[in-house]
Amino acid sequence: MNFTVKYSFLVICLLCCLLSTYVSVIEGHRARPGESRKNPREIIKTFKESGKGIIQGYYPSWVSYNHNLKDLNPNLNVVHMSFAKMDLSYDSIESIVGSPLLFKSLIGLEYIGLNEYFNDAMNLRKARPDIIMLLSLGGETYHPSSFDSALNAVEKIANLVDELGFDGIDVDYEPNGSFDGLNDKEKADFFVQYVTKLREYMCDDKLISISQSSNGALSCIGFNDPKKICMDDEAPYNSKYFNKPDVKKELLRAAQMASAGGAIYLMNNLKDMIDMVFVQTFNYTNSTDSTVMKELYDSYAYYGKKYDYVIIMGFTLMFPSTPFNPNDKMLVKSIGDFVKTENKLNKRADGFGLWSLSSDNAAHNEQLAIEYFVESLH
């Protein structure tokens, strides 16, 4: 009898817990813009008005087993939660609550279940109501099984963003699970269609970020491109620029890579539908000239000013051989001074970002890098 009472009490507690989570999810995430926090667009606007650069970081969901979101560096302004599937599929939020182990297999985020994610996100929101949190899709981890499956998932993604309390979406453009195939027109057209549909389904206050390769805004010169998908004659880093005799050798090499110009077609078609571009500089290796990061930023800044994007130059903590070492104080200051000047002149909020936060395998010091970012941008 005593065992039966205890068992019944346990079942009731479990049902109450599930019901509580269900209600909070159905009503939407409690950390909504309003009395407790600003609209994410208003947060971005305050950075632009002050000329302060945004500091961003990718938080891989799989590190949540050893780390907590609320313990992130207080100087971070934007967090990309990675990675979810571009073609995610689930029947309803209630079904994930009822079977928490489905969260990873259906959504992609590597939490044990929805409750674990929800508590982690709420702790961050309580500690940092000013932080912007985006759900990052795709990347090397999850490229869609088909274009149609990804497009059919957009409405679910928009609902998930709202129900789980994200401030928007980041879409990592690696169509083959790598930087190969960036200049394939069919894949580029799909990406434009995918992001356009996301914008249609998401609330106006939500942000859209796209992640691109380091040389994505340099016109390609290494191969014939009759459709000019990776060229822009009106941009400063066009084919004429690369015919100049004084072009940096490493910048010329970047324009000759197969990934060169991979963002040009996307930005010129998406225009002001997106809000932020994260530049993944870790595809640029085997270089001894780290100064080209200035030109790489400048190539994206042209589109940032044209379409009002925030440009985030990404550093990596993972590879000791990267030419863009986030713990190189002089490099960070040099690029930061240039970015800060542009921000002040143009009322922009361009900044720096990290791949990836809280990684136990980091080759560089996360806290030191963020300290250097703050010193150089603010």
Curated annotation (Swiss-Prot):
Disulfide bonds join C220-C230. InterPro entries: Chitinase_II/V-like_cat, Glyco_hydro18_cat, Glycoside_hydrolase_SF. Residues 1-28 form the signal peptide. The active site is at E174 (proton donor). It is found in: Secreted; Cytoplasmic vesicle, Secretory vesicle, Microneme. It comes from the Eukaryota. GO terms for biological process: chitin catabolic process; polysaccharide catabolic process. Residues 53-378 form the GH18 domain. One of its GO terms (cellular component) is extracellular region. Inhibited by allosamidin. Forms a hetero-multimeric, high molecular weight complex composed of at least CHT1, SOAP AND WARP. Within the complex, may interact with WARP via a disulfide bond. Endochitinase that cleaves beta-1,4-linkages between tri- and tetramers of N-acetylglucosamine (GlcNAc) from penta- and hexameric chitin oligomers. Does not cleave smaller chitin oligosaccharides. Required to cross the acellular, chitin-containing peritrophic matrix (PM) which is formed around the ingested blood meal in the mosquito midgut allowing the ookinete to invade the mosquito gut epithelium. This is Chitinase. It comes from Plasmodium falciparum (isolate 3D7). The gene is CHT1.
